[in-house]
């Protein structure tokens, strides 16, 4: 039984400084991560058709907390702290990096990771580290090459192919697609990917209902 997920009903639950302050490790979580200027907040707002679900900031690096959003029962989106921006003090960068690594390596309910990279500057060192962390934990990764509207169609396709070729080195399940919050490029594909990752939550519901019917 396929379930229609209403992403527009997504709402904020809580913020946490680290994994220990998050709610119980249960259900299914899909995490969004990216450099501080990769357009992560804009992508979340476009995905959910909401203008201010994730707060955008003109000062990259302001999002220092792990933000949790409820999509459906037992389905959550996690907005991880932006990373790697020059204006952020080194100690804070180290703290965020530790927080990211800990979340990816220890959070059992994490079923997929969306990594956002500016299509003009993809695969920076810390982007690659993030993907390797996920692959090491057998977590599937969707790379979104954001701000795709900044390139003409031919250049956009060439860049996607280039990053797809590079992504082979990661091993694991890593997909690469172009994305634009402004023009809506790749939004339907992203929703389809999240539908796939969230699907087991509804299979559990169906099994529970069947058990009740049997009783």
UniProtKB/Swiss-Prot annotation:
A Pfam family it matches: MMR_HSR1
Keywords, comma-separated and alphabetical: Cell cycle, Cell division, GTP-binding, Magnesium, Metal-binding, Nucleotide-binding, Septation
EngB-type G domain residues: 26-200
Molecular function GO terms recorded: GTP binding; metal ion binding
Assigned GO CC terms: cytosol
Amino-acid positions noted as binding Mg(2+) in the UniProt annotation, renumbered to this chain: 41, 63
Keyword check for Cell wall biogenesis/degradation: no
Protein's GO biological process: division septum assembly
Cofactor: Mg(2+)
Domain of life: Bacteria
Family annotation (InterPro entries): G_ENGB_dom, GTP-bd, GTP-bd_ribosome_bio_YsxC, P-loop_NTPase
Signal peptide annotation: none
The keyword Nucleotide-binding is annotated on this UniProt entry: yes
Binding site for GTP: 34-41, 61-65, 79-82, 146-149, 179-181
Function, as annotated: Necessary for normal cell division and for the maintenance of normal septation.
Record-stated family: Belongs to the TRAFAC class TrmE-Era-EngA-EngB-Septin-like GTPase superfamily. EngB GTPase family.
Name used for this protein in its record: Probable GTP-binding protein EngB
Organism: Aliivibrio fischeri (strain MJ11) (Vibrio fischeri)
